[in-house]
From Swiss-Prot:
Keywords: Protein biosynthesis, Transferase. Its EC number is 2.1.2.9. This is Methionyl-tRNA formyltransferase. Belongs to the Fmt family.
Length: 315
């Protein structure tokens, strides 16, 4: 077994908390946790601690919540902990070079893609959106660039035809902690090999927007179906009927060679709501109308049949 490392962990959401949990269960010593300040959440907008903070407090690990690292005080607070390494997972704050240089072995990051593909904020969603066959996690030595650091470990898994961003998030949240603990062993015993990224293969996973999730019927059905899975659970692919936003939870592609205008309903029955697109048909199997839970297509047709008559055009 490698020697234990003195680790500072920095992260915020549940995805990060699962990695912190693996570190706590390892033989390494988590000496401090950084997470974003408590934020208002829920209907009452009550200040709420992040999942990472809650887990750290359960294990009596000191928690630090600076707004940023611009002040000398915040930088000194970090330096005083005398850490070997800082592990960063979905922290949400930019780390200046002074912070990256503070731990003896620097900072490493767990990123939700196979770098250099999908650098940036939404790698899980963009991999599904683009129709990638696989994704994974990359553990890299952090530098000042955006996900540009040398790669220390890559773990991969296939993207199944039914995977959504929600399901892939869960899969990577299981894959990442295992890869992280393995990587820490390599770092501790000096066997980790850093591999530079090929910048020519890099692309950027920009943040999702609600506007992007509005279905463009001129796209081909395959692309629309990918969007449905990529934008689940947020911001959810949607279209409009009588100015009502309808969210799409599940869809499939069917061959269609007719000449109906994209956005036109060409069939509606218990097998689905078939809509013409730029190429082939998209078939909706599960939808959500405002104020209701997601429903199968038969329930939708029973309650809102007039919205989905053959020949109607969806916006």
């Amino acid at each position: 077994m490698s020697k234990p490392l003195r680790i500072i962990f920095a992260g915020t959401p549940d995805f990060a908390a699962r990695h912190l949990s693996a570190l706590i269960d390892s033989h390494h010593e988590v000496i401090g946790v950084y997470t974003q300040p408590d934020r208002p959440a829920g209907r009452g907008k009550k200040l709420t601690a992040s999942p990472v903070k809650e887990l750290a407090l359960e294990h009596n690990i000191p928690v630090f919540q600076p707004e940023n690292f611009k002040s000398d005080e915040a930088k000194q607070e970090l330096a005083d902990q005398n850490a070997d390494l800082m592990v960063v997972v979905a922290y949400g704050l930019l780390l200046p070079q002074a912070v990256l240089d503070t731990p003896k072995l620097g900072c490493i990051n767990v990123h939700g893609s196979i770098l250099p593909r999908w650098r940036g904020a939404a790698p899980i969603q963009r991999s599904i959106w683009a129709g990638d066959a696989e994704t994974g996690v990359t553990i890299m030595q952090m530098d000042i660039g955006l996900d540009t650091g040398d790669m220390l470990k890559i773990a991969t898994l296939p993207i199944e035809a039914t995977d959504t961003s929600a399901s892939m998030y869960d899969k990577l949240a299981e894959l990442g902690p295992v890869a992280l603990v393995d990587c820490l062993s390599d770092i501790a015993d000096g066997s980790a090999i850093a591999q530079k990224q090929d910048d020519e293969l890099a692309n950027y996973a920009k943040k999702l927007s609600k506007e992007e999730a509005k279905i463009d019927w001129t796209m081909d059905a395959i692309a629309i179906e990918r969007c449905v899975r990529a934008f689940n659970p947020w911001p959810m692919s949607h279209f409009s009927v009588e100015d009502k936003a309808i969210k799409v939870w599940q869809s499939r592609v069917e061959s269609y060679t007719g000449d109906a205008t994209p956005g036109t309903i060409i069939q509606a029955d218990k097998t689905g709501i078939y809509v013409a697109t730029g190429s082939d048909a998209i078939v909706f199997e599960q939808l959500q109308v405002p104020g209701k839970k997601a429903m199968g297509v038969q329930d939708i047709l029973n309650s809102r049949k007039e919205w989905f008559e053959v020949g109607n055009t969806l916006n």
